[in-house]
């Protein structure tokens, strides 16, 4: 690594409650490299949060919203070049390229360390380096892990306070020699003496780098979301998935929900959907009219850490403490519980500002306000939008909100032992081919379903079908190691649990997005998805029927509870049918994925594909 140029070392100001000599030495090393003006150890207190928010209001990064409309809430607007995750600048720097696999960007770790050494040398000059200790998962949980992020962004500090268990209490768990994941983040915009800062500092050069063997994360150049809040995708999925591979557990891009039947029986379900497929909506589902007595509760909306428990079953926690959700499309109609969560103590990013100091985004209301300030600080009216197509909120605009504020939060959401998972659900956005719901006949077939799932990336244009992007397990951008090894890890975990006599969770594949000949969605979705969920739970109890398909088991029309919904057998046929020519084409697409991953692909997957083909020919 480049030798830092000689400067007077900054005072570390280590609080007396920090007893971890390895952590202190690491902070000292990074401070010597990045040369901040000062080092601040974050305690996670409300006073600290309020002070940093006020500092950002004064600096133009955030504005305080009308307290009568949104108590203790703020709006931040980013630089237009820094609005989303940057997959092409995200690297897995494993020692061996084949351990990253063909679906990840790999770079040689030593060369990357030299590159980052140059970029981080003096990167925090003129700024404060914040030491942000955080726990992913309830403090002290056997499933939780600790991280420490060093960042020069106060925006990161306040978001991490909502998204994780952050602050002084983490050091009590860490003690003098506890393990932690070291995370280094800089916006990459040092300030010369007397240089005026900007509202949203960032750098056109961006790197989001993971070292799986040493469990390190380094992020440079972005202040936004998953690039900068390193506990989220970087730690909770990319690094944690490699920890899970090595230690026999799973880190998954999954919501976790509880479902209680009218008789009081409670089930727990984990579900993986790629982005824009309704994960948060499903996590906060409200059962529809006609399904009285059923109750859905939210444990997590995005990430699940899943470990075998002493009882042999898989137990899951939500490692996060908040929601970092996409705002556009969220409304009282689509997600009542999310809207109720956003009434206070929220940080909004890149949404629009109303004239009375509140927020708005596309899809929040049927009729937009007559005038707004858009996410780039410009006047916006419906007429301007009609003329230019300009959105008031950025399509990836976000809210950061405390999970505890969600009306549907599950009483077990902070149980350190986690909740026992009864079923896994995998789903993508497909306008054709994939049925509304299918149950895998066994664990291997379920892993095959999840490994080959995909979503359409482009809207159908001039009758053209959307391009299907394979997104295995909804983990394509987030798996920290070779995807074939990841499939193998799932298969081995299933075998290991079966050998102990444990009951494995059932695996289901869903698709809410089949379209009819008119190009419209056939299935009503949202709360009505409860009907599909109820069928799955009936299958677990041996109470619901099903029909063998070439690809798993699906319900017949009479197996679904239609109380309160007019949905004809013809419509049901449109969403459940298996079109054999379409499936032959689908299997050819599966082959493309398997060819890409051939070097380490577990043989169970091509064998399962052959079995499907045989059933189609029968």
From Swiss-Prot:
It is an enzyme of class 4 (lyase). GO terms for biological process: cellular response to glucose stimulus; gluconeogenesis; glycerol biosynthetic process from pyruvate; oxaloacetate metabolic process; propionate catabolic process; response to lipid; response to starvation. GTP binds at residues 276-281, 398, 429, 526-529. Its EC number is 4.1.1.32. Catalyzes the conversion of oxaloacetate (OAA) to phosphoenolpyruvate (PEP), the rate-limiting step in the metabolic pathway that produces glucose from lactate and other precursors derived from the citric acid cycle. Its main location: cytoplasm. Keywords: Cytoplasm, Decarboxylase, Gluconeogenesis, GTP-binding, Lyase, Manganese, Metal-binding, Nucleotide-binding. PROSITE patterns: PEPCK_GTP. Monomer. The keyword GTP-binding applies. Mn(2+) binds at residues 233, 253, 302. This is Phosphoenolpyruvate carboxykinase [GTP]. The active site is at 277. Substrate binds at residues 85, 224-226, 275, 396-398. Its cofactor is Mn(2+).
């Amino acid at each position: 690594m480049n030798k830092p140029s000689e400067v007077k070392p900054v005072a570390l100001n280590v609080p007396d409650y920090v007893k971890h000599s390895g952590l202190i030495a690491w902070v000292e090393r990074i401070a010597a490299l990045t040369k901040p003006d000062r080092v601040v150890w974050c305690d996670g207190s409300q006073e600290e949060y309020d002070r940093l928010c006020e500092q950002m209001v004064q600096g133009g990064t955030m504005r305080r919203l009308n307290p009568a409309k949104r108590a203790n809430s703020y709006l931040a607007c980013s630089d237009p070049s820094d609005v989303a995750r940057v997959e092409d600048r995200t690297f897995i720097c494993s020692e061996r390229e084949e351990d990253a696999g063909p679906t990840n960007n790999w770079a040689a770790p030593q060369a990357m360390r030299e590159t980052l050494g140059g970029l981080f040398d003096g990167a925090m000059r003129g700024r404060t380096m914040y030491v942000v200790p955080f726990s992913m998962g309830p403090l002290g949980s056997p499933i939780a892990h600790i991280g420490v992020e060093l960042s020069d962004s106060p925006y990161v500090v306040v978001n991490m306070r909502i998204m994780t268990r952050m602050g002084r209490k983490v050091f009590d768990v860490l003690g003098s020699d506890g393990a932690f994941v070291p995370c280094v983040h800089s916006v990459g915009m040092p300030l010369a003496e007397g240089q005026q800062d900007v509202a949203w500092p960032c750098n056109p050069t961006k790197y989001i780098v993971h070292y799986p063997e040493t469990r390190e994360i380094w992020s440079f150049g972005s202040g936004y979301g998953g690039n900068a809040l390193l506990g989220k995708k970087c730690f909770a999925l990319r690094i944690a998935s490699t920890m899970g591979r090595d230690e026999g557990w799973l880190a998954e891009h999954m919501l976790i929900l509880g479902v209680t039947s009218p008789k009081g029986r409670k089930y727990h379900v984990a579900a993986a959907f790629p982005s824009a497929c309704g994960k948060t909506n499903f996590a906060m589902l409200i059962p529809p009219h006609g399904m009285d007595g059923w109750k859905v509760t939210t444990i997590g909306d995005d990430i699940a850490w899943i470990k075998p428990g002493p009882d042999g079953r898989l137990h899951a926690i939500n490692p996060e403490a908040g929601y970092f959700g996409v705002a556009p499309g969220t409304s009282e109609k689509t997600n009542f519980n999310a809207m109720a969560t956003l009434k206070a103590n929220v940080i909004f990013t890149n949404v629009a500002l109303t004239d009375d100091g509140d927020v708005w985004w596309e899809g929040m209301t049927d009729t937009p306000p007559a005038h707004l300030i858009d996410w780039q600080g410009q006047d916006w009216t419906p007429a301007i939008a009609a003329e230019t197509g300009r959105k008031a909120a950025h399509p990836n605009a976000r809210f950061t909100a405390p999970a505890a504020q969600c009306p549907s939060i599950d009483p077990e959401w902070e149980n350190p032992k986690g909740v026992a998972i009864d079923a896994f659900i995998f789903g993508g956005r497909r306008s054709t081919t994939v049925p509304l719901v299918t149950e895998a006949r066994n664990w291997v077939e379920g892993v095959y379903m999840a490994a080959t799932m995909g979503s359409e990336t482009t809207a159908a244009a001039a009758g053209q079908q959307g391009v299907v992007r394979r997104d295995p397990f909804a983990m394509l951008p987030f798996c920290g190691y070779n995807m074939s090894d990841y499939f193998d890890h799932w298969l081995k975990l299933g075998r290991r649990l079966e050998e102990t006599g444990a009951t494995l969770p059932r695996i289901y594949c869903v698709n809410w997005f089949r379209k009819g000949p008119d190009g419209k969605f056939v299935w009503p979705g949202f709360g009505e998805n409860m009907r599909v969920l109820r069928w799955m739970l009936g299958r677990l109890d041996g109470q619901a029927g099903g029909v063998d398909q070439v690809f798993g088991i699906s319900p017949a029309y009479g197996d679904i509870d239609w109380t309160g919904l007019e949905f004809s057998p013809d419509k049901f046929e449109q969403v459940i049918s298996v079109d054999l020519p379409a499936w032959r084409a689908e299997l050819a697409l599966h082959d493309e994925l398997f060819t890409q991953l051939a070097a380490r692909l577990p043989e169970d997957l091509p064998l399962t594909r052959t079995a499907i083909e045989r059933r189609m020919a029968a």
